[in-house]
Amino acid sequence: MLENYGILDGTRWLTNRRGDSLEDTSRYPEGSILKVINHRMVQGVEMCDIKVDYYKYSGVEDGTYFWMGTDYLGRDLWVRMWRGARVSLLIAFISVICNVCIGIVYGSIAGYYGGKVDMIMMRITEIIGAFPEIVVVTLFILFFGTGILSIILCLVVQNWIGTARMIRSQFYRYKGSEYVLAARTLGVRDMALIFRHILPNSIGPIITRAMIAIPGAIFTESFLAYIGLGIRAPESSIGVLLSQGQKVMQQYPNQVFFPAVVISLLMIAFNMLSNGLRDAFDPTQRGA
């Protein structure tokens, strides 16, 4: 019995139930009636190829063009790419904000009090940071499933450690300053000293580090989606588009090229922004 087997370049090809092409007549004896019938059927199919206009059946008007082509389901790659970039940026910004908040609180306490408090808190960060990131990500995906919240948690669970260490070093630098000693002599409480007198001097390094962390978060999210541990279709992100485009890269290289260009431009832009902020807050680092 004949059935539709697939579509190639808009043409429907007929096969039998076994999946053999109708042009394969080697299984029939020479001169048999089955071979003659098969040959006639192939000639009929070749003369009556059915062309399918997918854009017409999808309701796309004539004269409509897609700047970057379409994906394997006919969806506009331009629209999907920028929606995916929006998701990637959302995940990156939320995760970086959470990292900065946790790092500020943790590093401020460790740096201000010092001594045993600092030693215990730093040993905790070393224990957390000792686990390989891919192991932590896999465990989170197993327990919480895939989705935006899971990816944000994966990016937060370890990445705040660097911010905490940076804040700790800033507190060690400023807590012995004369204005801090004067405020302490006047009876200013510890929390006020931390958040009103010492922390404002660290705003520049904090902002610079946050801007540097955003490209890393974008790349990590895209990498997780690419290997199947992040956001999955039908949701869109840069990593999802790269993963789907990689399957048809030889036939349709545009499905990989344009998402790769977008993620590269995003990372370059944020790196340049972070370098500019670093030079603005710390002129001694200019040109480094």
Feature names for model-found ranges:
Residues M1-L73:
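Membrane-topology segments of multi-pass transport proteins
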Residues T70-A288:
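Alpha-helical transmembrane segments of integral membrane proteins
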